[in-house]
């Protein structure tokens, strides 16, 4: 039987969400039906559809009282809202149904594994986090009567019961279920623990998969763990990271570790580390394996240090997901590219080749806020490079966001300080990028309220939200020195 708290959330979502017009949302990026969203949850393929659940507060545009919102899609671009999947309606999750993942059971049902949050103590000040499950049919989910399935009694000594969250569950080829969960030691240094189960309901501690040892920030949130191109990959979102060059500048950052496990699959050793995204707004990524074998990732296109609430009350929603991205490992690094399904939504091609830029310039037909651009730049004179190239977009007389490249520094910077956002806010990030004989390739995707930049065929990415008024449709170029550019621009449309 569905709890009254969940029934109320479902009714509220449907009624209040209907008041938001499609024009007030991005075209392709998933936004909450109503209210607030942060982490993607339960990203999975089930019964012929992609399912995406999301951390949701339907009642306001700020974080509070986490529910699981729910959308489905057949192509990862057209999202249909389904009723709220879970509400904080049990004693063990009364202070929040936190993040988790999904797996299909042998009987065809889908199991959601999530973190339930309760409070203890005489003044209810201590937050306790445990792992719980719910089982359903893709629409309605019922919480297991034996929850929590992993209580704090199954934590090794010295690990935090207050920071013990975000289970990633999968089923191995031998039928064993495993999950990894983020936690930390008393000094808050991150630890990933691994559990195993025969039925996804009764769990035992298996190992400490990996310890941070204060190398990459502190607590590691939202772990994802999978095999890609013959390598074992761990994604996580560390808190309180310190910068390393231009990487990990967001405080709450994202980390990719590529390596291997031991023979018993109980311990992970990394060989390569990198930031997943070098922009401003990217957190808590989750992945799935598509039916055609692609590993696809989606993330919260926001950051805890840069939650700009400007205009959120009027829009009645806050937070959006990135475009889904296809992942590969190339040259020992994680590469990301927009899902190929987006190519089917390109129209109105405008192309220029060998354009000479020297100063400020606009090009006829190059404008818009829902566009997909492929840009290649190189110095006109290979013996003497230019000082700077800048792409300005979401531009009018008052506003603009810029993407600028300085070849002598090898840096690419995204900067939204003139986008209309409040001043006391994170505005810019830089990435150290490579050129191929002086040539830099960029793919820039704009979708009304965001920019996603894919550098050198996905070797690096930079992501940022921009809440600039949609009347700012301009795109222009500005250089210090002579730059030769090829550009192809497509409008993006939705049927």
Regions found by a protein language model. Give the residues of each.
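Beta-rich carbohydrate-recognition and catalytic domains
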Residues: 1-166, 171-216, 229-278, 301-352, ...
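Beta-rich accessory regions
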Residues: 10-15, 255-281, 286-495
């Amino acid at each position: 039987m569905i709890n009254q708290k969940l029934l109320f959330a479902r009714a509220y979502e449907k009624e209040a969400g209907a008041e938001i017009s499609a024009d007030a949302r991005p075209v392709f990026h998933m936004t909450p039906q109503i209210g607030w969203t942060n982490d993607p949850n339960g990203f999975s393929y089930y019964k012929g559809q992609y399912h995406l659940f999301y951390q949701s507060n339907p009642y306001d545009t700020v974080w509070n009282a986490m529910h699981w919102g729910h959308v489905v899609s057949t192509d990862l671009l057209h999202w249909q809202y389904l009723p709220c999947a879970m509400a904080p309606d049990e004693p063990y999750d009364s202070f929040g149904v936190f993040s988790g993942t999904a797996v299909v059971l042998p009987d065809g049902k889908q199991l959601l594994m999530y973190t339930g949050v309760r409070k203890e103590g005489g003044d209810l000040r201590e937050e306790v986090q445990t792992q719980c499950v719910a089982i359903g049919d893709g629409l309605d989910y019922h919480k297991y009567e034996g929850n929590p399935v992993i209580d704090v009694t199954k934590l090794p000594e010295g690990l935090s019961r207050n920071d013990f969250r975000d289970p990633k569950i999968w089923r191995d080829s031998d039928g064993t279920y495993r999950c990894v969960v983020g936690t930390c030691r008393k000094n808050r240094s991150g630890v990933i623990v691994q559990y195993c189960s025969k039925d996804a309901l009764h769990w035992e501690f298996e190992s400490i998969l990996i310890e941070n040892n204060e190398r990459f920030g502190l607590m590691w949130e939202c772990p994802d763990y999978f095999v890609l191109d013959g390598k074992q990959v761990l994604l996580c979102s560390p808190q309180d990271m310190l910068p390393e060059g231009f990487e990990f500048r967001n405080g709450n950052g994202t980390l990719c570790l590529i390596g291997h496990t031991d023979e018993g699959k109980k311990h992970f050793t990394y060989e390569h580390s990198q930031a997943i995204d070098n922009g401003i707004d990217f957190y808590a990524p989750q992945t799935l394996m598509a039916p055609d074998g692609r590993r696809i990732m989606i993330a919260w296109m926001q950051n805890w240090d840069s939650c700009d609430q400007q205009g959120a009350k009027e829009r009645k929603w806050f937070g959006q997901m990135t475009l889904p991205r296809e992942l590969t490992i190339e040259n020992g690094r994680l590469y990301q590219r927009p899902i190929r399904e987006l190519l089917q939504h390109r129209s109105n091609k405008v192309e220029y080749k060998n354009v000479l830029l020297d100063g400020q310039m606009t090009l006829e037909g190059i404008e818009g806020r829902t566009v997909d651009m492929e840009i290649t730049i190189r110095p006109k004179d290979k013996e003497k490079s230019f000082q700077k190239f800048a792409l300005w977009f979401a531009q009018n007389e008052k506003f603009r966001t810029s993407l600028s490249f300085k070849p002598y520094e090898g840096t690419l910077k995204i900067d939204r300080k003139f986008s209309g956002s409040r001043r006391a806010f994170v505005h810019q990030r830089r990435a150290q990028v490579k050129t191929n004989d002086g040539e830099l390739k960029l793919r820039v995707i704009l979708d009304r309220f965001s920019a996603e930049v894919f550098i050198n065929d996905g070797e690096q990415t930079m992501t940022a939200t921009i809440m600039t008024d949609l009347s700012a449709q301009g795109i222009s170029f500005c250089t210090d020195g002579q730059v030769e550019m090829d550009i192809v621009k497509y409008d993006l449309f939705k049927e």
